């Protein structure tokens, strides 16, 4: 039997001592037994695969049974910080093999120096190209332009920057689309869209294929005015109202317009641009949405729900809107009323095409007047334009305001005297002549406005010097055309005048009388002459005039018994002081009612200090005993005879006077000479305007009154001796 040997502690200690003894003598033997040394194992921590292979190799080399039974220390596996991947392994192998490969190639190139020069240069160029391509790819991704930078609006702005807005008329600027496309760095098809819109507004015109002529904005106002008229002819305004919900009555016109548009074969971008601009011009709000414009511009042959046609139309309209925005004709706004995000465009281009057509002259005027603006405030041109009087009269007559006259700077001369026996006071009020008829009375009445004018009346030779010059102050007369009513009212006036010995109730109405309303109601800016005759030669002598006496009223009542009642509106005039006005208040049936007299007014300055002369309801007399004696006002359709002198013992006492008739002196023209008629014949014509109880010297007949216009009637102030 084979004996089994057992290891004892002595054997183990012998191995340690053996190692210590041989370690100093032989280094190779130390390397063979280093795996059994614990300190060496702690210092070296191989991987699992390495430890296994080392253990296997160690056991193969060491055949000693003592080493074979030594159990190795199991180390904990540590995860690799960067786990290997196939790509990482490939990179590691390439890096490991690259030095050897480079060394091998470098050795080959050492023996071929001439061929090596060309190859090295080519390799360097290829490396540079590869690097530049990589950098360009990175820059391209970083510097990629946005959609706004590539938009048609920005491209149009660059295109417009190449040419002036207002070129010289003698200068011809040609546009080559190929050159422009190359200059802007875009395709030519992008330039086509811009040029088509510009051609629709006549900013450019086609000369040849891909050749255009630049005109600028000089023709833009005329083009827009023509498009506005064309849009109205095609009833685009009714279409816009219908889309806004206001054009239900225009359905028939809209159908006709659609039928006309459906027959139109030209569907180019230029025509569509013109239609799009027409919608802005005819719109009341001058705002258009692309949705509305697309539905209007779609022909009747296709349904609006046809998506492809509708979307195409909207896309093309959006391109047109971008170009128009670059031209500063429209702008995109946001409507708060609209809940959708669809764009809304508003017209900001020229609106007054006639005034903007002379843009060159306007710019010249602005540049010339710019230096004088600080020195002198410029007045608007409308202040220097004199409008037509009929227009002013129509506007003023509709104004519900109380009239008052303007203050005049002209001097008033009352000191002139005439040497003739029949002295005449000529009241010259102005030079304007604008006769017309004032409306606003009932049908039974005739309201005549008498412009007091001096231009149409001949000036007698004996009256070369006017005695008074007053501002434009017309008189307004209302009279009734009913003869019987006039006679009845005169009878009432007779009865009221018989009680003239009592104190007259004086009405004082102070009102601010506006000059514009006076002109509209009485046709202002006209003048009138009124002679006042005095046998003593001094028409303004207080002794030559008398007050309105009740006896004279009774004496003259028989002459004007059939005359119709009259009403006088007398404004505040400084030259009419101390004149008596009889204003009848009682009326017969069918006469002038009180409400029909808006100017039944005597202003307070005229009647200041007046004393009441009667308290009857039939008449009210106003008298101012200041400078002049009261005289009689007689107003008729033609020349006037001189009335008798009214003596007023209340104010100045009785003054004898003679009867005079200046009719021949007043009318140098034979055609206008008036023959005296009876008061009865004059009342039949109903053309007299105003009479007081004084006697009539003469009145005008009907045929002569027709010859004389309302602008030629005169106001005569006269007096004669009492019968």
Swiss-Prot record:
Gene3D superfamilies (alphabetical): Winged helix-like DNA-binding domain superfamily/Winged helix DNA-binding domain
The protein depicted here goes by the name Transcription factor E2F7
What domain of life does the UniProt record list for this protein's source?
Eukaryota
The main location is nucleus
Composition bias of kind Basic and acidic residues appears in: 494-503
**Region annotation (Disordered) ranges:** 121-146, 356-379, 395-417, 489-546, 650-689, 702-723
The primary gene name is e2f7
Q: Which parts of this chain does the entry mark as a DNA-binding region? A: 147-216, 264-349
Regions of compositional bias (Low complexity) in chain numbering: 520-535
State what the entry records as the consequence of deleting this gene.
Embryos lacking both e2f7 and e2f8 contain multiple intersegmental arteries that completely fail to migrate from the dorsal aorta. Gross morphology of these embryos and initial formation of main axial vessels are unaltered.
Task: Extract one GO cellular component term from the record.
Answer: RNA polymerase II transcription regulator complex
InterPro entries recorded for this chain?
E2F (IPR015633), E2F_WHTH_DNA-bd_dom (IPR003316), WH-like_DNA-bd_sf (IPR036388), WH_DNA-bd_sf (IPR036390)
Q: Where is the composition biased (Polar residues)?
A: 356-370, 395-405
Name one matching Pfam family. E2F_TDP
Task: Give the UniProt keywords, A-Z.
Answer: Activator, Cell cycle, DNA-binding, Nucleus, Repressor, Transcription, Transcription regulation
Q: Does the keyword DNA-binding apply?
A: yes
An example Gene Ontology biological process: motor neuron axon guidance
Please describe the quaternary structure of this protein.
Homodimer and heterodimer: mainly forms homodimers and, to a lesser extent, heterodimers with e2f8.
